[in-house]
């Protein structure tokens, strides 16, 4: 399996497995500023990593409950390797780097979500689980279920050319196994905002305390990536 690696919609490298190594090979002519990771600047020689997927790409892989959902929904597309998992979830994510099966353009078209309804509704565990399954391909890595979505009340205007753009919000859920998790993050963000020492992403808490909506800082108002993110 060979994957295409894109930076801000531009194809810059190939990612594949060779024997017991993972390999990232930049395409000829790739500009220095189109690096995939701070740890892997553009160069002619391929980057290699033994046994496991490069750490930069592992940061984007789902885990826990979300990983189980991905396996259930996309099992036939998975071969047991992180490379196949990245092929399913890598097309849209946080930051400017996206990963797709070879020859496929980045981005995933998902139906907009009525966020105002989520903020006022009584959100059950089953209802949020259904949303996680629906938006599994635009899920965000981490143990807590969360995904990227566009608000139906904020239609994106056409840009005039095919360009990767993504949802403006991250939707996070809490259930009986993680009570008050959203509250904890929401009020932590509020405290940081009041301290005024660092920029803080805008966020909203649902009336029932089960849904947290965080506005993304890594995209502009059009949903276009404006910065890279590296954990």
Give residue spans per PLM region:
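Phosphate/dinucleotide-binding and metal-coordinating scaffold of catalytic cores
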Residues: 1-231
């Amino acid at each position: 399996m060979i994957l295409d690696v894109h930076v801000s919609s531009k194809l810059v490298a190939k990612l594949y497995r060779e024997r017991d190594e993972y390999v990232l090979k930049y395409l000829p002519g790739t500009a220095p500023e189109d690096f995939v990771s701070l740890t892997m600047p553009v160069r002619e020689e391929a980057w290699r990593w033994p046994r496991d997927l490069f750490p930069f790409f592992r940061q984007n892989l789902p885990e826990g409950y979300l990983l189980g959902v991905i396996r259930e929904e996309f099992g036939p597309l998975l071969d047991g390797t992180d490379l196949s998992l990245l092929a399913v979830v890598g097309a849209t994510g946080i930051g400017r780097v996206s990963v797709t099966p070879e020859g496929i353009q980045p981005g995933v078209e998902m139906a907009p979500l009525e966020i105002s309804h989520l903020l006022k509704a009584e959100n059950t565990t089953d209802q949020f689980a259904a949303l996680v399954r629906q938006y599994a391909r635009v899920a965000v890595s981490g143990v807590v279920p969360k995904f990227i979505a566009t608000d139906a009340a904020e239609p994106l205007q056409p840009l005039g050319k095919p360009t990767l753009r993504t949802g403006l919000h991250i939707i996070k859920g809490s259930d009986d196994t993680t009570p008050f998790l959203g509250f904890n993050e929401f009020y932590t963000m509020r405290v940081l905002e009041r301290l005024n020492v660092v920029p803080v992403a805008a966020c909203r808490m649902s009336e029932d305390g089960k849904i947290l909506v965080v506005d993304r800082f890594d995209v502009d108002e059009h949903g276009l990536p404006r910065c890279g993110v590296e954990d």
